[in-house]
Each structure stands twice: as structure tokens, then as C-alpha cells.
């Protein structure tokens, strides 16, 4: 897994409230150099409501919200294929600031 890369992920089909589910893009925020069995990701949505902790970044010409409020770790078996997109340094920093703000760090 590459930190700052956006992969296709499968968040499962469990219906629990407003949690994102199904197949979508997810940004890997866990460290690249740690070979773990889970990856920490920020799920994305093209339809989510705006919020200070949901930065909007264009992916492949589509305005996409990064749902920092739904940050989670998933088994690496549910991270599919090669990266679909790579965030630029300033875009990744925008997500990191949103994570810090959301977690009160």
C-alpha cells in the first residue's frame, strides 16, 4: 500500500446507519513502509454533504469528498488492484489537516 494513493476498496455490504459501504475509492493514509495486514483508509463519495472535515478534491475530473469522519482500517485483501490515483502533496496535506481537525489533534 502506498500512502497518498487512492485505490478501489470494498467496504462490504453491512447496512449500519450512515456508514459508507460497497465498492468505492479509498485514500490510504497508513504508512507506506509498514507491511501490515490492514490499511487505514479514508473512504470517498461524490454525493456526500460538505463539511470542514470532508475536503473536496478532483479525481479523474470528478469532484470527490474525502470522508475523514469515516476513517477506518480494513483488511488489505479488500484493497483492489493498483492505485487508481495519486494525490499531490498539497492535496494529501489538505486531507491530513482535516484528519487532525476531526480527531482534535
Q: What positions do the PLM features span?
A:
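Conserved functional hotspots at enzyme active or ligand-binding sites that engage polyanionic ligands
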Residues: 1-105
Amino acid at each position: 500500500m502506498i500512502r497518498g494513493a487512492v485505490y478501489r476498496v470494498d467496504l462490504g455490504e453491512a447496512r449500519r446507519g450512515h456508514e459508507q459501504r460497497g465498492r468505492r475509492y479509498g485514500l490510504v493514509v497508513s504508512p507506506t513502509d509498514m507491511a501490515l495486514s490492514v490499511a487505514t483508509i479514508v473512504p470517498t463519495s461524490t454525493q456526500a454533504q460538505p463539511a470542514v472535515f470532508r475536503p473536496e478534491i478532483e479525481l479523474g475530473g470528478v469532484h470527490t469528498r474525502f470522508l475523514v469522519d469515516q476513517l477506518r482500517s480494513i483488511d488489505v485483501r479488500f484493497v483492489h488492484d493498483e492505485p487508481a490515483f495519486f494525490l499531490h502533496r498539497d492535496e494529501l496535506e489538505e486531507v491530513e489537516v482535516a484528519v487532525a481537525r476531526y480527531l482534535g489533534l
